[in-house]
Amino acid sequence: MPAHDTPEQRARRRIDAALTAAGWVVQGRPGTNLSAGLGVAIREFRMAPDHGFADYLLFVDGQAVGALEAKPEGYPLASVEPQVKLYSEGLPNGLPAPHRPLPFLYLSTGVETRFANLLDPEHRTRPVFAVHRPETLTDWLRAETLERWLAALAGGS
């Protein structure tokens, strides 16, 4: 890493590498291609008005499923939970998403990463070793859909 990088640039470089290692295709705007892989992470994604820019918006199979907020190493990640939740609620109209708000939220310095799964009724952020693979998020979305379908089926009997 260049010595003149800012702490935030170093964090983003580490986060890009972690996302890539987990199977995500990391892209900037413009030139976004949601078909570049099962999981695509788009940097600096403009959210709906009054919701700012998500450092990374996560797409699985062409649908928005989560957001990642990047901070420099040493930054207290718990303090930015409201910020990433704002992104999860601020998906621009017209973008495909299986859930609104977006269910999968990450906070990361590139060294420390925290995660919340809003599909869990008792969700909270917790430390994780790495960003999850796109296949894992797909499995969680399918399981949640199956649970809703089974609950509806049981209620209709």
Task: Pin down the residues of each PLM region.
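ATP-dependent helicase/translocase motor core
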Residues: 1-157
